[in-house]
Amino acid sequence: MRIAIGSLQCEGNSLTPVLTRKADFDLAYGPDMLAKLQIAELLEEKQIEVVPTLYAHALPGGPVAKADYLELAGGIVDGVPVEGIDGVWLYLHGAMCVEGIGSGEAYLLRRLREKIGFEIPVAVAMDFHADNSDEIPQLANYVTGFRTAPHADHKQTQLRALQALIICVEKHILPRPQISRAAVVIEGDAVQTAQEPLRSIMAEAERMEREIPGMLGVQVFNGQPWIDEPYMGPNFIVTHESDTAVAKQCADRLARMY
């Protein structure tokens, strides 16, 4: 099995005029990026050949300057081969805003799909506070995120995305995640997964994932309110191996629980 990996993160605030620049990112290229991630052991265990592209992480800040973003996103897309890979693993934030573009995650995934098409599975790991546009589940075959706030499961989240990607490759499946939304706006850091209403919602998501046959992933994203976009806010992405109707029903149920 041969997979390409990449990571581009910056939790954005579209309400500030101060741009985030390339110099604000911690960068690692090629094999050096594996030291920044927490998936090396599983890659070795499964004897997966890795095509590393770019790791770029910045602290939360304003919109990423367009030219700098295009260079960074291009570093990932250009590093993914057109042929000879079985899948793509990405570690993104989910609330990156880019000057003149909008969602940095959606743009990156669009560029990637333009290059590799839709017959290669793409798995994405994100932050719990991801503001996912409707494009995200249309462009990725699996989307997961942190399941703790405050965040204490970075490694588990990265591994979960990799494990799902391995399943997709081994079973030759291309799942189609489904998304639903809750029409509320809550300051992200005020929400903790150990307290209501998230405690019950997270428990139900875990039950769905555990008990429903063929369920690949049930993810709760609380979103964050500093992205001035229509897709800002809590969103729920559910991935079933083959049944999109079941996935949508589960996503809708979680949204109603908020």
Where are these predicted regions, by residue range?
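Generic secondary-structure signature for well-ordered alpha-helical cores
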Residues: 81, 114-117, 145-148, 163-174, ...
